[in-house]
Amino acid sequence: MSEAASGVTIERPDPVVTPLAGLIGAEVDVDLREIDDDVFGRIRQAFLEYVIIVFPNQQLTPDDQLAFARRFGDLYRYPHSPGMKGHDMVLPIKLPSGVRRGRWHSDATFDERPPAISILAARELPSRGGETAFANQYAAFEALSDGMKELLAGMEAVHDASSHNRREEWTTHPVLRTHPDTGRTALFVNSEFTRRFADMTTEESEGLLEFLTTHAHRPEFCYVHRWRPGDVVMWDNRAAQHYPVMNRPEGEIRRMWRVTVAGDRPRYDAPDT
């Protein structure tokens, strides 16, 4: 007999939220296939607070992962990246093995409306390596001096997809971004997609942009996730950067499924004075 048919309300315990680092990340112990609206609300609250959430020991099908993502909003389709056969909104991720250099970034900031949330599920893991690092961009902003914050408040930057051989895909975004749900301010430039400041040349932009994109991932802002079988990790592209660590043995597979939630156009709301 179902819970509804029996007329009995079963009290489910609140999900346990365990912080993972000083300024970013928490683990939430819950089965994502069996969450009601109340539990989802608590997950969303933890997500907005901690910026990335790790869900251990999941057994999600593509439909399960899509259903969870849709609780947050419409889905985002990556340009020029084919999805999984039969589930075109699920993007298979297979990075090269061996030791290679990655790039710190927020996803697809060359888009006028970059994705808001990424949800990555581990499907097959190497014997070692293949971590993902995350950096809190609220913390990156808050650690800047008052003078630097004042300078950046009126600035915009040009983002393009030239690192993906598509230089013609570009847009401009504010250098500081107001999160649409929390109202907090985040630094919003990254070394993969941000090319220069608007109304400046690349040469003129170079020094300040290099400082900001390096400052963005100071170690104290970061959490490094060591993937385990069954892990699902979601992060907020509006307030975090991430870095795929490509350091696993040659020939060993790291296979992931990614589902992405669509976002809005970045904006900066100056604080009231």
Question: What are these model-derived regions, one by one?
Answer:
Residues 2-234, 238-273:
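Fe(II)/2-oxoglutarate oxygenase catalytic core
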